[in-house]
Every structure is written in structure tokens, then in C-alpha cells.
Swiss-Prot record:
UniProt organism field: Vitis vinifera (Grape)
Protein name, entry field: Peroxidase 2
Biological function: Removal of H(2)O(2), oxidation of toxic reductants, biosynthesis and degradation of lignin, suberization, auxin catabolism, response to environmental stresses such as wounding, pathogen attack and oxidative stress. These functions might be dependent on each isozyme/isoform in each plant tissue.
Signal peptide (from-to): none
A GO term, aspect molecular function: lactoperoxidase activity
Length: 12
């Protein structure tokens, strides 16, 4: 989990 991608691995 990343702050830029949220719970998924895609950047929105």
C-alpha cells in the first residue's frame, strides 16, 4: 500500500 496508489497498485 502506497500513499500515491492507495490500496491498489494503480496511480489515479
Amino acid at each position: 500500500i502506497s500513499p500515491l496508489t492507495g490500496t491498489n497498485g494503480e496511480i489515479r
